[in-house]
């Protein structure tokens, strides 16, 4: 008898094989902002708020991310990684997260964990990634 991990692996393999044959993207990454509250030497995404404000390129807005997400979902994207910098520093993180979950994405969050407080835990329990 299969355990849950074996069953999940078989389902994942099936999805990837089927998507690959049809040239459907299953995985995507949204790098919300280069801002991070840590300065890890091994990481290339670690700008301060000041560095971002003096940067000459505008940040992607919530509406722009939502439009990208709608297009990606229409193409078959299923798994979406939210990353940064530190994604919880992005001002509209929770609005975007909520919308992505309701669009049907399976969301993962790449975070250093330093900003996960009781409120974040409550929100993640309400709408699990």
Regions found by a protein language model. Give the residues of each.
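Conserved alpha-helical substructure of the radical SAM core
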Residues: 2-127
């Amino acid at each position: 008898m299969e355990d849950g991990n074996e069953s999940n692996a078989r389902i994942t393999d099936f999805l990837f094989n089927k998507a690959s044959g049809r040239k459907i993207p299953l995985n995507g990454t949204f790098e919300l902002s280069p801002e991070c509250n840590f300065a890890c030497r091994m990481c290339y995404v670690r700008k301060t708020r000041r560095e971002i404000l003096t940067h000459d390129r505008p940040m992607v807005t919530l509406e722009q991310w939502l439009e990208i997400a709608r297009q990606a979902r229409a193409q078959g994207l299923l798994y979406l990684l939210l990353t940064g910098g530190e994604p919880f520093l992005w001002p509209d993180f929770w609005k975007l997260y909520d919308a992505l979950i309701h669009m049907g994405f399976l969301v993962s969050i790449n975070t250093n964990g330093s900003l996960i407080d009781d409120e974040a835990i409550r929100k993640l329990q309400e709408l699990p990634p």
